[in-house]
Amino acid sequence: MDRIAIVDLGIGNLANVKKALKGYITSDPYEIEKADKIVLPGVGNFGAVVDKLAPIKDIIIEGINEGKPFLGICLGMQLLFEESEESPGKEGLGIFKGKVVKLKNVRTPHIGWNQVWIKKECKLFEGLKNGSYFYFVHSYHAVPQDPDIIATTTDYENAEFVSSVCFENIFGVQFHPEKSSKNGLILLRNFRRL
């Protein structure tokens, strides 16, 4: 069975992610390095999480570059990008070119159930219907430079944003699969089976 490291940055409830993925929660660089797959859940402020991530940032990037499946959840997806309007001057992981911007002309935070619309084939969404509902809690969203990494989009109050990205071994979801009932469990199971 694959060893799935769920990165603990001291924020958020990781128990549901751990249960669904049958992984282990850790902030130990050695344990992350040994993992077959890496999951980075995150809530909170981009800059604060970048600071907490500093001691293990290079290990995570190295794992991604080695081809280990990686899943970023919510802020964990945003951290795949270079920067965020939320914390000017703070650098994300920089795996994807692009930035994170505040949702504009809508009520924030965006909290609740919303549909995701599939834009390209992605292993995470196998067995899920186009327009499946997932649970969101966020005020910022990623704007990738490369449209080819966009796996799904979501419409919120007539504004469309990228709700997931997918490229080779790298996956990011803006929503919370661990709070998304059956659909979320299917998505996490798909990641576990990669």
Swiss-Prot record:
Please indicate if the UniProt record lists Hydrolase as a keyword.
Answer: yes
For this entry, list what GO says about its biological process: L-histidine biosynthetic process
Q: Where is it predominantly found? A: cytoplasm
Cellular component per GO? cytoplasm
Report the coiled-coil segments: none
Q: Which residues form the active site?
A: C74 (nucleophile), H176, E178
Q: Which reaction does it catalyse?
A: 5-[(5-phospho-1-deoxy-D-ribulos-1-ylimino)methylamino]-1-(5-phospho-beta-D-ribosyl)imidazole-4-carboxamide + L-glutamine = D-erythro-1-(imidazol-4-yl)glycerol 3-phosphate + 5-amino-1-(5-phospho-beta-D-ribosyl)imidazole-4-carboxamide + L-glutamate + H(+); L-glutamine + H2O = L-glutamate + NH4(+)
The Gene Ontology terms for molecular function here are: glutaminase activity; imidazoleglycerol-phosphate synthase activity; lyase activity
- What SUPFAM superfamilies does UniProt report for this protein, alphabetically? Class I glutamine amidotransferase-like
Keywords, A to Z, come to:
Amino-acid biosynthesis, Cytoplasm, Glutamine amidotransferase, Histidine biosynthesis, Hydrolase, Lyase
Look up the record and name the pathway of this protein.
Amino-acid biosynthesis; L-histidine biosynthesis; L-histidine from 5-phospho-alpha-D-ribose 1-diphosphate: step 5/9
Please report the stretch or stretches of sequence annotated as the Glutamine amidotransferase type-1 domain: 3-194
Q: What's the EC number here?
A: 4.3.2.10, 3.5.1.2
Reply yes or no: does the keyword Transmembrane helix apply: no
Matching HAMAP family, A to Z? HisH
* Subunit and partners: Heterodimer of HisH and HisF.
Q: Function of this protein?
A: IGPS catalyzes the conversion of PRFAR and glutamine to IGP, AICAR and glutamate. The HisH subunit catalyzes the hydrolysis of glutamine to glutamate and ammonia as part of the synthesis of IGP and AICAR. The resulting ammonia molecule is channeled to the active site of HisF.
> What protein is this chain from?
Imidazole glycerol phosphate synthase subunit HisH
Organism per entry: Pyrococcus furiosus (strain ATCC 43587 / DSM 3638 / JCM 8422 / Vc1)
Upper lineage? Archaea, Methanobacteriati, Methanobacteriota, Thermococci, Thermococcales
